[in-house]
Amino acid sequence: MTEGTQVFLLPISTSDSTKEPLSTVTSQAQDSSLSANRPVTEKQQEEAEWESISRLLVTRGFKPLCLVKGANLRDFIVFDKQSSQRMRQAFKTLMEETTRQQSMLQELIETNHQLKSELQLEQNRAAHQEQRANDLQQIMDSVKSKIGELEDESLNRVCQEQNRIKDLQKEYKTLQMKCQHYKKKQMEQEETIASLQKEIRRFAKEEEDRVITQKRLFTHLCRRVPHSVLDKQQCGEDDSQSEGKDYLNLGVSPTYKGLLTSLQKQLEKSNSKIDVLLGEKLNLQKDLENRPTEHELRLYKQQVKKLEKTLKKNIKLQDLIGQKKSDDMEKKDEPSKDIHQQALVDQRYFQVLCSIDSIVHSPRAPGVIYKQSKERAQNRSKDAVQECGFEHLVPVIEMWADELTSLKDLYKSLKILSAELIPWHNLKKPNENEGVKVGDLLLMVDTMLEEVENQKETSSMPNSQTLQAIVSHFQKLFDVQSLNGVYPRMNEVYARLGEMNNAVRNLQELLGLDSSSSLCMVVSTVGKLCKMINEDVSEQIKRVLGPEDLQSIINKLEEHEEFFPAFQAFTNDLLEILEIDDLDAIVPAVKKLKVLSY
């Protein structure tokens, strides 16, 4: 072997040495003998290099290499100088590669931790933003609920005000009716006063005529022929005096005085009689006003007859009950008790029928339209009438029941009429359990009359053609085919408008804007906020990725795409070599190999 060869001895097992041929052993012995002759400096240099490699192996966790001197060559493998150099270079490159890979792994772990921390920060920020959004949603829900409560309160107030207005309108109508009634009474009283004044004038005129006739009679008596000397003298004196003094001269005579006093007394009596007659007339008029009418008088007479009949029947029943009680005390038989109970029940029924009869014949009851046929009235006997007298209640109650059932038809017709006259009014539906009431019908009629009067008063009311054009315009505007869908769509539009106004008001409060700010200002402020949020997101992305421009981001991603496949292949090879399944188990496995190499 030449001098360029190098002897490198490694320990091997005896079983392997026996399997090798003898030629290799002899060649190794020759090489070892030749290597002893090489220069000392090269040998020391190589030993130093191997020691440095051994130190590198020790730092990496492997067992150190040992240089053996003067030992049996059976247990060693000998390499030449070139293979030893290549082995040293391979060891160095492997060590450098492992250090580079470890540094790369360390950088990847650090970047992974950094990304995890940034991800945690972003998650915390997202959770904070989500919590803030939830808080804002809760605030919005509470504001919506408060707005709903305020709307309900306003609706209740409006309903109360409408009910109050209706009550005031009803009171106004009643006051108007009372005023008209009092006006009618005033007119009647004025008419009576005028008639009384006419009668007074007539009486006064009659009195004046009577006084004139008395005067004429008196003058006639005074001008009659005198029968005595005194009368002749008096007549001569009267003739000699002037015509203007005849009345005074005649007053001196006692006959004239007596006639005058008698006439004055008669006049006073007649005046007193006139006053008495006027007072009696006024009292009679008051009595006539307070007295019932002919119809009420008939009803009262019928009620008196019915009450007399009921009184007789009650007396008879009380007599029967007294007899039954005496019989019960004497006999104490059970059939008599049953008869007594039956009599009590009959008395209760009779009282109920009497109360119904009194209601039927009361002035408040409606007029009875039903009339019994003459044949039934003739065939019915007088005894039956005296005994019962309640046969007329059945047709009356039937007639009232028919009238009450016809109220529903009347309500339907009035509803149709109101739909034609006032379609914009939503009339309340009567409760099915309570039925139709006359008050509801009167309210419907009053509302229709009010609307008709208002239409007559307001001459500026549009005609039917303009109203139809407005309705058709609303149908086109709201995309509704029928008239019934206009009101729901309008309510929906108003509801959406209210929601939009509430949302705008909430945005104004959240953004700190004035309530008088326009929608354009709100939109511009929201756009500014979105722009700020987008800028923050872009800055966060730049902070995470590092570079500022897009091309550098693309380059970095391409570098990552080039690096990760090689790193993945390297890690897969390591996993296969070390026979493990997890990346975290690579470092412990390498440490174990390092410990085993020692």
From Swiss-Prot:
Record keyword Manganese present: no
Gene Ontology cellular component terms for the protein in this record: centrosome; cytoplasm; microtubule organizing center
TPR repeats by residue range: 484-517
Alphabetically ordered keywords of this record: Coiled coil, Cytoplasm, Cytoskeleton, TPR repeat
Ranges annotated as biased composition (Polar residues): 16-38
Region Disordered, annotated ranges: 16-43
Molecular-function GO terms, alphabetical: gamma-tubulin binding; identical protein binding
Coiled-coil intervals, chain numbering: 99-210, 255-317
Cellular localization per UniProt: Cytoplasm, Cytoskeleton, Microtubule organizing center, Centrosome
GO BP terms, alphabetized: cilium assembly; regulation of microtubule cytoskeleton organization
Domain notes: The coiled-coil domains may be important for tubulin-gamma-binding and hence for centrosomal localization.
Task performed by this protein: Plays a role in the organization of both preexisting and nascent microtubules in interphase cells. During mitosis, required for the organization and orientation of the mitotic spindle.
PANTHER family: CENTROSOMAL PROTEIN OF 70 KDA
Quaternary structure (record): Directly interacts with tubulin-gamma; this interaction determines centrosomal localization.
Protein name according to UniProt: Centrosomal protein of 70 kDa
Species this protein is from: Rattus norvegicus
Lineage: Eukaryota, Metazoa, Chordata, Craniata, Vertebrata
